[in-house]
């Protein structure tokens, strides 16, 4: 919803009727369907966009193939590169998070098996990002102490116990350790945390 352009015809796809019900008034029409069974004709759209969602699909190859099938021009996917380095949150406090994400996010090679050659474009995250994914609060460390913030980040839900990491972060913020280690980040307007735009500009020929 947050990334839907308003200057062209858009059709959104959501697997959940509940998610469709949460779309704001005036949003583009939405169709309830899984990624692996898009109810559209081949080449129905000029472009397809998937934002931080592919790693949730139980059949990623099937979903990517469907994106390719319904798209005439390009497929664009926002994802996270499993070979990217962690950042202070995962390096100092929650190393399990990056291990979990590396196991579930698709690699470039995996996507190219279905989409053909792709281009990876770095997407630096601005310091005031409001979208609430894992790296959004890299310059606002206190936010990660908020259970509501963590509740919107799916990887936290996969951890067995977040309390030890939270306690270390809380202590380091209180005694100034975080500021001594990472205070330089407060001067940065944006940071490359491994998020990538995957662009497949020329779909492979459709299967007969």
Regions found by a protein language model. Give the residues of each.
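Local beta-strand N-terminus motif with an aromatic residue
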Residues: 45-46, 72
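A conserved beta-strand element that flanks and buttresses the S-adenosyl-L-methionine
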Residues: 49
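GHKL-family ATP-binding catalytic core of two-component histidine kinases
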Residues: 39-41, 58
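Conserved class I S-adenosyl-L-methionine
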Residues: 74-109, 128-135
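A short glycine-rich, Lys/Arg-flanked "PGG" loop and its adjoining helix->strand segment in the class I
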Residues: 61-75
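Conserved Class I S-adenosyl-L-methionine
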Residues: 119-208
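Class I SAM-dependent methyltransferase SAM/SAH-binding core
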Residues: 1-38, 62
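Short catalytic micro-motifs in class I SAM-dependent methyltransferases
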Residues: 52-56, 79
